[in-house]
UniProtKB/Swiss-Prot annotation:
Official protein name in the record: Myricetin 7/4'-O-methyltransferase 2
Molecular function (Gene Ontology), one example: kaempferol 4'-O-methyltransferase activity
Lineage of origin: Eukaryota, Viridiplantae, Streptophyta, Embryophyta, Tracheophyta
Reactions the enzyme catalyzes: quercetin + S-adenosyl-L-methionine = rhamnetin + S-adenosyl-L-homocysteine + H(+); kaempferol + S-adenosyl-L-methionine = kaempferide + S-adenosyl-L-homocysteine + H(+); myricetin + S-adenosyl-L-methionine = 7-O-methylmyricetin + S-adenosyl-L-homocysteine + H(+); kaempferide + S-adenosyl-L-methionine = 7,4'-O-dimethylkaempferol + S-adenosyl-L-homocysteine + H(+)
Keywords (A to Z) from UniProt: Methyltransferase, S-adenosyl-L-methionine, Transferase
Keyword Methyltransferase: yes
Family, similarity comment: Belongs to the class I-like SAM-binding methyltransferase superfamily. Cation-independent O-methyltransferase family.
The UniProt record lists the keyword S-adenosyl-L-methionine: yes
Its biological purpose: Flavonoid 7/4'-O-methyltransferase involved in the biosynthesis of polymethoxylated flavonoids natural products such as myricetin derivatives, aroma compounds possessing antioxidant properties and exhibiting pharmacological activities such as anti-carcinogen, anti-viral, anti-thrombotic, anti-diabetic, anti-atherosclerotic, and anti-inflammatory effects. Catalyzes S-adenosylmethionine-dependent regioselective 7/4'-O-methylation of flavonoids; active on various hydroxylated flavonoid substrates, including myricetin, quercetin and kaempferol.
GO biological process: flavonoid biosynthetic process; methylation
Subunit structure: Homodimer.
E.C. numbers: 2.1.1.-, 2.1.1.82, 2.1.1.155
Activity profile over pH: Optimum pH is 8 with myricetin as substrate (in the presence of S-adenosylmethionine).
C-alpha cells in the first residue's frame, strides 16, 4: 500500500513538472508583453517606488479600455516570475525587483535588448528546427531554418542585424561597467593600445577609452557593423575581418567572440592575435571574456544557463562553450605560453593569455 502511495505521489510530482514544461512557452511571451507595454519603465520612472494597480493601468499607453481587467492577471504571472513585487497592503501596488530592473530601457546593467533578440522570429525559428536539423546534412539549425548562416543572414537582413547589434550593445554596456570596476582592477593598467575585436557599436571600447584617456582603443568589426561610426579622441573604428588583418596593439580584447567559432577557427584567430600584440615583456596579452563550463557550481541556475548557451552555440554557429581544459588546449595550440583566469563575471570569466 505504501509503495502504491509513493508511486502516486511521484506521478503527481512528475505531472506538475510536465505542466511546467508545457506552459513554459508563456513565460517569455508575458515578459515581452510587459516590455511592449512599457511596464518596467513606468514603474522605474514612478516617483513612489510602489505604484498602485489603478495608476499603472492609467499610465499604460494605447491600452484598450475593455482590456484593463487583463492587466492584474498579467501582473500576477510576472510577480510569479520574480520581475515585480506585489504589495497588497499598499492598495494592490507593484514595485520592480532587481531582475525587473534589468528590463528597463537603457539600464546600464540591463539585458532587455538581449531578451528581445532571443524572442525574434528568426531566433525562435532556429530553436524550432532542431529536430529537422538532426536529420539533414546542414552545419547548423540556423541554416536549416533560414537557408544561410547566422552571419550571412545578418549581412542580408538590416532589421535582424539591427536587433542582433542592439543585443550585443546591451550586453556590452553591462560588461563595460564591470570591466572598469574594481573587480577587473589592473587589467588595463599600463597598456598604451587595445584592439576590441568584434567590438560592434563600440560600447565596451568607449567605456575603456573614457576610463583610461592615455589608452588608444580600436574597434575592429565587419563593414556592415561599423557602418558610418566615427571615432574621436583615443577611440577609433576600423572596418575589416579579424581573420584577415588585426591592427597592432599592446593587447587585444575578445569579448564573447571565441565561443562563436569551432576549434580550428579559434586557433587561427588566436594565432592572428599573437602576431598582432607586443611581447609578454612589453605587456602583450589577449584578454578573453567568455564562458568556462563547470558542472560543480553551487548555483544550479547558472549551470543550467551554461548548458543552454552551449546548445545555442552548437545549433546557431556549429561552435560550443568550453571547459578550462578545452580553453588551455586552444591557447597552447595557438602558441601562447600561459594563461590566467583573472575573475568570474557571473556566467562568464575574464581570462588573460600571454605570448
Amino acid at each position: 500500500m505504501a509503495s502504491n502511495n509513493n508511486c502516486a505521489y511521484e506521478l503527481i510530482e512528475a505531472e506538475a513538472q510536465s505542466w511546467d514544461y508545457i506552459l513554459s512557452y508563456l513565460r517569455p511571451s508575458c515578459i515581452k508583453c510587459a516590455i511592449q507595454l512599457g511596464i518596467p519603465d513606468i514603474l522605474h520612472k514612478n516617483a513612489d517606488p510602489i505604484m498602485s494597480l489603478s495608476d499603472l493601468i492609467a499610465a499604460l499607453p494605447n491600452l484598450n479600455p475593455s482590456k484593463t481587467t487583463f492587466i492584474p492577471i498579467l501582473m500576477r504571472v510576472l510577480v510569479d516570475f520574480g520581475l515585480f513585487n506585489y504589495h497588497q497592503q499598499q492598495g494592490d501596488g507593484y514595485s520592480l525587483t532587481t531582475v525587473g530592473r534589468l528590463l528597463v530601457e537603457n539600464h546600464h546593467f540591463g539585458n532587455r535588448s538581449f531578451f528581445l533578440f532571443a524572442q525574434h522570429p528568426v531566433v525562435l525559428n532556429t530553436a524550432a528546427s532542431v529536430g529537422d536539423w538532426l536529420k539533414d546534412d546542414l552545419r547548423t539549425a540556423f541554416e536549416t531554418a533560414d537557408g544561410k548562416s547566422h552571419w550571412d543572414y545578418c549581412g542580408a537582413d538590416p532589421e535582424f542585424n539591427g536587433v542582433f547589434n542592439d543585443a550585443m550593445a546591451g550586453d556590452s554596456r553591462l560588461m563595460s561597467n564591470l570591466l572598469i570596476s574594481d573587480c577587473c582592477a589592473g587589467v588595463f593598467e599600463g597598456l598604451t593600445s587595445l584592439v576590441d575585436i568584434g567590438g560592434g557599436t563600440g560600447a565596451v571600447a568607449m567605456a575603456i577609452a573614457g576610463a583610461f584617456p592615455s589608452l588608444k582603443c580600436i574597434v575592429l568589426d565587419l563593414p556592415h557593423v561599423i557602418a558610418d561610426r566615427k571615432g574621436s579622441g583615443n577611440l577609433e573604428f576600423v572596418a575589416g575581418s579579424m581573420f584577415d588583418k588585426i591592427p597592432h596593439a599592446n593587447a587585444i580584447l575578445l569579448k564573447w567572440i571565441l565561443h562563436n567559432w569551432d576549434d580550428e577557427d579559434c586557433v587561427k584567430l588566436l594565432k592572428k592575435c599573437k602576431e598582432s600584440i607586443s611581447s609578454r615583456e612589453n605587456g602583450g596579452k589577449v584578454i578573453i571574456i567568455d564562458m568556462i563550463m563547470e558542472d560543480n557550481y553551487n548555483n544550479k541556475q547558472l549551470v543550467q544557463s551554461q548548458h543552454l548557451m552551449d546548445l545555442i552555440m552548437r545549433i546557431t554557429y556549429a561552435s560550443k562553450e568550453r571547459t578550462e581544459k578545452e580553453w588551455e588546449k586552444l591557447f597552447l595550440e595557438a602558441g601562447f605560453s600561459g594563461y590566467k583566469i583573472i575573475t568570474s563575471l557571473g556566467l562568464r570569466s575574464l581570462i588573460e593569455i600571454y605570448p
